[in-house]
Amino acid sequence: MKEKSQIDDIDRSVYDIRDEEHDAYRMQEGLTPAIVQKLSDEKGDPAWMQEFRLHALQIYNEMPLPDWGPSIEGLDIDHIATYVRPNTKMQNDWKHVPQDIKDTFERLGIPQAERKSLAGVGAQYDSELVYHNVKDEVAAQGVVYTDMESALTGEYADMVRKYFMKLVTPHDHKFAALHGAVWSGGSFVYVPKGVQASIPLQSYFRLNAKGAGQFEHTLIIVDEGASLHFIEGCSAPKYNVANLHAGCVELYVKKGAKLRYSTIENWSKNMYNLNTKRALVEEGGTIEWISGSFGSHVGCLYPMSVLKGDNSRMEFTGVTFAGHGQNLDTGAKVVHIGKNTSSYMNTRSISKSGGISTFRSSVVVQKGASGAKSAVSCQSLMLDSESRSDTIPAMDIRTRDAAVGHEAKIGSISNEAVFYLMSRGMSEEDARALIVSGFADNVSKELPVEYAVEMNNLIRLEMKGSIG
């Protein structure tokens, strides 16, 4: 009889909750000008956004699919519903959210997290936010945290128009163009000059609909001398058809400002996660990326930082766990433009049961970026002989005094370490899970404690059945 381990106490079903679909509106599948026009009408877009969407669709139709990275041949946009509106309007009081949707988010811990440690929460269900709230003390500082649709047509409409898809343009790649055509939902954040937002904000994205896509847009502007920590969570139940996530994140870090952007992605194993994230950092500014990627069938995610200002800096800390049937192609990019800029990438990748984990790094030091410093470190842990781990670095250095380095290591779990932990009373499965959690502590130690616990639980879930 198999010994019961601590891992057996972790239940995957909390993430695989499937609500019965009671959509107020579901767009027909596929992607045509008529569908994009109808989506725009449904959302009440201003004229410039409607024109933007149709132009992005034209770019999408003209651009080829990427000829590198994991295969996405199982994804057919003709069988994806690009817009699914839930059966509720956005609420700022949790008790007014419909019970079935509320039950899902409560099982995922969203209300508890808000009460314990968050300054504000946005919760998106399929294509629209169903809940958004910011604490009074944060709003009193002048911090703006609202849904993108309200920002698009309200007080901050001019700011949205100035920044929307200027950093990630529809010409960037085919799925950026798709996003520009059918985006819906997401969050708008503005932190005024000099404001230190000491408590994190969070957005949580849940895709419940079968055969649908989620295309939220996150736009954050941290003004001069200000600071913010923003946390993003994602999940979906598993279906036997493809789902698509092609969100977009644009971050503007002004002079002397600091932004930490943390993400824990736990998409279901039928998800194609083709997300695009980018930050523009001005003089003396800092962008910190914290990234944990655990879900999706195919994942392509490479947050990019443009260090435009002198003395600007970037840090990327990430962990990726690829299990059975997963091909996760992740990494980070940085472009050094200003003088005396610095970047550091510290990543860990774990693969088991035939999973494929690929780390891509891109470091570009432009001609005028004198004194640039960049270091890349990638460590990989393979848990069996069927799995695969690749590291693909790219460097383009155009100044003579740059200091750039890359380090990559690959290894497996030591039998001696497992034996030692078992001698202290652990089961073999728990011992292996503890070692893997320790390997990924580069990310967990950077998260607030509630999210570090959640990440370690996800690792323990992935480790179920890793022996025998």
Predicted regions and their residues:
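Intrinsically disordered, low-complexity terminal tails
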Residues: 2-20, 25-30, 451-467
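N-terminal amphipathic, basic helical "cap/leader" segment at the start of enzyme domains
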Residues: 2-10, 25-172, 176-177, 346-349
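Short acidic (Asp/Glu) and glycine-rich catalytic loops that position anionic groups and cofactors
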Residues: 18, 33-37, 396-397
